[in-house]
Amino acid sequence: HHHSVWRQEIDARLKALLEWLRVRDLLAPEVQLQLEKMQAHNRSDKILVAFVAEFSRGKSELINAIFFAGFGRRIMPASAGRTTMCPTELAYDIRDPACLRLLPIQTRLESRSLMEWRLVPDQWVTIALDMADSDQLAAALGKVAETIEITIPEARALGFWHDGVPDKPLPTATGMIEVPRWRHACINMDHPLLRQGLVILDTPGLNAIGAEPELTMSLIPQAQAVIFLLATDTGVTASDLTIWREFLAGANDDATRFVALNKIDTLWDALSTSEQIEGQIERQRVESARILGVTEDRVMTVSAQKGLVAKINRDAELLRSSHLDA
């Protein structure tokens, strides 16, 4: 909702600026063209929000809680050991049926960019989604967790094995390397938020075995907002801080960076009062903001898993406690 209001505000401001320049005879043709282009971009364009985090911070679960609670079960793979292995976009294009499109990892052998691959739909594997069948939906979307085993020379060719780099992926017992089966996934489905032009990017955990940070990080600059997830019980770990500093901090527009402290339920404790628990959560929030160098209003606290359970069971009190009732 905020997003559509925000878009209308930008539209109104651009309109006012055009008018102001026109009245004062300051509207050069190239300026007018640029402003009109911005207007069109604002009206038609998608807003890309990327979820980024260290492995197992709950990115996919948060997406489940926000987008899939109505299906009465977990849809995106988010259980231990089954996790998003390739960047996965959630969007809605009214011209296409509900489907999952997958780009095979082997396309990395060619020099074409992801943008170019988007233009060759026949190179993608397309799976129809039955939005009325949550089991079929979950089984189909489980494909984003698929991996394949390849030889070391193949892994080298695909960019998953670099000689002389210390933290290479561990070969399996048979000397093979496990890599993501897919390079990129796109889910097209109808949802009120997606209908407004929101596009969600779920990314592989950044220290998942074989997950190439560049698979994820090349997409970050295109995002209008990035939500960085942390676990509340650990706060900002050394590896969280490395990811933040390396990929997310110091962007020319820090206003696009948000932090979600997930798993606040790990601090819920039968022996503490709810005031004590909220106090603990608040301290973690303030401390996380300080360590990451962001203002406190950029850090929100949630429990994706409890929020998902609360929505499925229609438990208003649990939903309030999960902070996902907003």
Positions of PLM-derived features:
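Globular "head" domains of long coiled-coil molecular machines
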Residues: D11-A12, E36-A326
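A short alpha-helix capping/helix-coil boundary motif
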Residues: L17-L18, P29-V31, R195-Q196
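Solvent-exposed loop/turn elements at secondary-structure boundaries
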Residues: V23-E30, L35-K37
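Charged, amphipathic alpha-helical linker segments immediately N-terminal to NTP-binding catalytic cores
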Residues: H1-L26
